Amino acid sequence: MAGYGALSDVYEWLIGDDKLTPAKAATVYYSDVVGSLPPHARVLDCACGTGQLAVGLASLGLDVVAADASDGMVRRTEKVASKQGVSLRALRASWDELPDHLEDSTFDLVFCVGNSLGHAEGAAGRLSALEAMSRLLKPGGRLVLTSRNWELVRAAGSRVDVRDRLIRRHDRDSVVSYYWQIEQRWEQEHFLEIVVAQIEPDGAVRACSERLSIWPYRYEDLVAQLRSAGLTVQSTTFNPESDGYLVVASRDQARGTPEPAR
């Protein structure tokens, strides 16, 4: 998984208002998964982005590790943590590198949110990522994963999506556009170019863009791969007609550390 080098500088224009601050980001998941954690529970956000969720969780007194494959995202997470006055560990690591930095079976909760899993390279890369997350969880620990409904994304075909309103951050407006390149077969590499066009005070437009690789997956394939990684779905919001969904899966109590994908 790679990318989010350029976009790390403008990522707040891609975050919804409901998750824009650390407090708001943590609140989104509090009632469903975070509120039941014991004090000082250990939590990993393994695709932390600019750190709103990780910092929000740390503000609740949780022992948080924030990881991302993008150096820029990790730097921004550290800056947000410093600004909020909270302590967390931030590290640059792709999913398959996480077990090299973190001890197996030590986390109560792992987050993989923000549609991040679609950047894992194909079915093999996706399974490897899920296995890495699973092995870091304590038996009975939970993985929280959010995803686009890739069935709907593919059905819509290649297209340009321009947001229908200006997005305002830091007293500056931007137009955000998504350029989708959808391939014929599920297993092919798809592409998404995101453009954030910032409108300067003098009326000039400054665009920041990045082309990202995507490997979409069907919901039933995700559930099967979770099972292969030793994770059992506890709850899901998947609806064939909804744009996205949330899955909570727990690591099997009786299963040992998953073998890495080959």
What are these regions (language model features)?
Residues M1-A47:
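Conserved class I S-adenosyl-L-methionine
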Residues Q52-L98:
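Class I SAM-dependent methyltransferase SAM/SAH-binding core
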Residues D100-L109:
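A short acidic, Gly/Pro-enriched loop at the edge of an enzyme's catalytic core
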Residues D108-A124:
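A short SAM/SAH-binding and catalytic strip from SAM-dependent methyltransferases
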Residues L127-P139:
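A short glycine-rich, Lys/Arg-flanked "PGG" loop and its adjoining helix->strand segment in the class I
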Residues V144-Y219:
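SAM-dependent methyltransferase
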Residues W215-R262:
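C-terminal lobe and adjacent flexible extensions of AdoMet/dcAdoMet transferase-like proteins
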